[in-house]
Amino acid sequence: MTTVTPLVEGGDFPLKAVVGEQIPLSAKVFREGHDAVNANVVLTDPAGGEHVVPLTRTNEGLSLWETTIVADREGDWTYRVEGWSDPYGTWEHDATIKVEAGVDVDLMLEEGARVLERALNQERPESAQRLLRDAIAALRDEDRPPAARLAAGTAPEVVREFAQRPLREHVSPSPDYPWLVERQRALYGAWYEFFPRSEGCYYDEATGEWVTGTLRTAAKRLPAVADMGFDVIYLTPIHPIGTINRKGPNNTLNAGPKDPGSPYAIGSKDGGHDAIEPTLGTFEDFDFFVAEAERLGLEVAMDIALQCAPDHPWVTSHPEWFTTRADGTIAYAENPPKKYQDIYPLNFDNDPAGIYAEMRRMVQVWIDHGVKIFRVDNPHTKPVEFWQWLITDVAQTHPDVIWLAEAFTKPAMMATLAKVGFQQSYTYYAWRNERWELEEYMEELSTQTADYMRPSFWPTTHDILTPYMQYGGPAAWKVRAALAATLVPTYGIYTGYELLESVPRPGVEEQIDNEKYEFKNRRWEDYAPGGPKEGQLWMADYLRTLNEIRAAHPALHWLRNWRKQSANDENVMCFSKRHVDGGRDDTIIVVANLDPHTTRETWIHLDMPELGLGWNDGFVAKDLITGESWQWGQHNFVRVGRDAEPVHIIHVRRF
């Protein structure tokens, strides 16, 4: 027995899944000679109970055996594949041939009786024992014709009994490989990001100064977020902001006395990572925010940025946690050509034990206040072994905590962060705009890396505004949101997406007047109730529709079920997702025009078996965006673009 898949680094890291996720498993099973072989996988649940799942041979020439495994509870599981010699299968195969040919008839029938007698020595229900005893008697009944005797030993009920409780010889087990099963939010969810200080802020004309939003005013925005159908509210850092080298608007070096600074420059005389920026409120206010989110069905995700402003308390209490340059000054953060004079990066080399302990204490502070999801800023700039230790240690007492890696870096580092514990990862989605790029990327994410990495797709963030979004207009913003919401189970939206905030800061791929450095009053009161005023762009309704579609269709809750479909036009992408669970068969087809400037007319060609249909079958194609329906088959004409909806999200309704 060889080539067990899935297997993460030979079993050094766990296979990842969530409860109910269907994991395809395979192995190559063979032996010398011509005797029959068989295989099963033994799943050991967190309580130590064993569950045996048979494998099915799917390619005899390649000795390939396959099955699907599913876990019904969270926790640390293991899986072990066992290949074994199958005495009953060997006898059934040989006897069928020889008895029909009249070769060694009595000998073969007696050997069959003896195989069944060996099976009687195993623990079996009385009904099964009676079945086997009757078959043994028939095999040895010389008054019957040989064919009838053989039929008794190979009857369907006998075959089923050996399939359920096989007679196994020469069992060859694999090691017990680790399998981590987590809650569904580790794979599936819709995120919404905002800066709390902007929610409820306003410009005071009387004083000429901005008045900050607070955690209490930010909580007033939560009903709108929940109404759009999001599952997670993600807060940028809420800690005290440093005053030394504070950045001004658009990342300028000289902040005014009233400029709020970047929340990623963490720490001041008011505290560090375990404190709250006083202008935002108190821990009582934070607890209120979390409680309000929970009341509305939202989970709170908190940003962890392990870096410090020059006036962070750690700078004076633990100078060894930072890098000292030759002139005696502490090195600020750089990513040439970018410079971050308001941030000191941590150096884990000098006192790793001290830093580890403090980070663990800090994380626990927020867990104790109801946070179960952490979005980690730039984890690839910290030691991998630190994250492995921290995530593992937290999981010992809080296994429901989820970690999202904001690591736009090399694939090897992204993969390693996922293997050591991060449940989710940001991706290159924002920069994958061509059809071939998206299809190639999805082939990778849904197969090669799906055993350990769960992608999160974001069309924009507070750091990212690609040229496609800058110049694509409303069609581009619809397409990128719809693709993010349907390609993968987890996606995120940065606040302001509803307003199509597409103006960039010259020379960089981020918004002008970036919210990282200033307040932004979006005047939500102008849009509700009753929607936008005439002439105003508004995408909240579209986002709500996407999230309603996601919630209603289990096919969109999973990653491994993505399948590429075909379209004649290279600017039109077509794919499908299908999920079968019990009696429900849910199938979705997505057709998207990737050219936001032109309406495209083309033909799509569907792999009907991937949809659970025959090649000549027809079905009702219900567009979940517009409510329209069409009669579709294998080949279908579509029209998508700026003069029509740029994306079809089709529910397959079988006749």
Tell what function each PLM region has.
Residues 309-320, 387, 395-396, 408-436, ...:
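Substrate-binding cleft/loops of secretory-pathway carbohydrate-active enzymes
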